[in-house]
Amino acid sequence: MFAKLENLEQKFIEIECSLAQPNIFNDQEQYRKLTKTHSDLKPIVTTFQQFKKLQQQLSENKELISDIDPDIQEMALEEIKKLELELTHLEYELKILLLPKDPLDEKNILLEIRAGTGGEEAALFAADLFRMYCRYAEKMHWKVEIMSQSDSDTGGFKEIIALIQGDNVYSRLKFESGTHRVQRVPTTESQGRIHTSAATVAVLPEAEDVDIEIRPEELRFDVFRSSGPGGQSVNTTDSAVRVTHIPTGIVVTCQDEKSQHKNKAKALKVLSSRLLQIKQEQQEIEQADARRALVGSGDRSERIRTYNFPQGRVTDHRINLTLYSLIKVMEGEIQEFIDALSTHAQTEALKMQATQIAS
């Protein structure tokens, strides 16, 4: 590990020298590549340099143990304990920083939320979840664009799909996929009984043209008039588009735009991301990587989180984390869950790495 860190530090120094050259801006593509690599390496190199600095201090304090002055010996022993603890922490941090990055982490995402069991109450909860993610996106200065939505009769969503664009969106929200369960008293409940409903969340990395190749002969397009809640027609032209990917049977419908061309473009974007998700899941099964182990089978029927309104708590069942701040969570304050899930995934990845080395 330390030989690799030395090499990375040397590479970092060389890049800094290159970036200091006056003619570096002549090649903009090379400049962007170097600044990106420099940015990626900086946390690792900075931590490694701090590690080496503490190692030097540890060595100096160990030499002081042989001093004839007992007070100096005692001070040195106390400092050694402190330094050894800090070095253990930094070594663990370096192992985390050296873990392979998920190549999808920097991508934008398609967020898909669907009402599950619970009828209209599930649709209302789906709307609450969408609002929660929109609030979080606002805090992160991300852009949210609704791609498709199917409204329920009471103001909820049977289904809603949105494109979220910004820095490292997928890396932050990728662990939100799964079944989210709510326990609360519906507004229509006269007896005050608590009902349990659910909605599924799918976080798909946005597919780019280089990620997925879709041949025209694999697609079937159908057009029809768009409709609103209850099935009433909201358009007099055939602007809604249904795209079927024949090899997989995946069907995507978009009818939010008045333009058939725009609906078609949105439908193809959603389809591409779903196909990319299938491709990624197949790779994960083959590699049995740490993220796959974290989210289980990937089956969206798997309950991952419960929102209990009467008790004001939210529990993530994957990591046994409960927060008694439900109102804040529903307002988009979900960073504590995101950080805990990310840390858990890193820990699992380290365990898997250690197992592979041992075998």
Swiss-Prot record:
It comes from the Bacteria. InterPro entries: PCRF, Pep_chain_release_fac_I, Pep_chain_release_fac_I_sf, Prokaryotic/Mito_RF, RF-1. One of its GO terms (cellular component) is cytoplasm. PROSITE patterns: RF_PROK_I. Keywords: Cytoplasm, Methylation, Protein biosynthesis. Methylated by PrmC. Methylation increases the termination efficiency of RF1. Its main location: cytoplasm. It is found in: Cytoplasm. The modification N5-methylglutamine is found at Q232. The keyword Magnesium does not apply. Belongs to the prokaryotic/mitochondrial release factor family. NCBIfam families: prfA, PRK00591.1. Peptide chain release factor 1 directs the termination of translation in response to the peptide chain termination codons UAG and UAA. This is Peptide chain release factor 1. It comes from Lawsonia intracellularis (strain PHE/MN1-00).
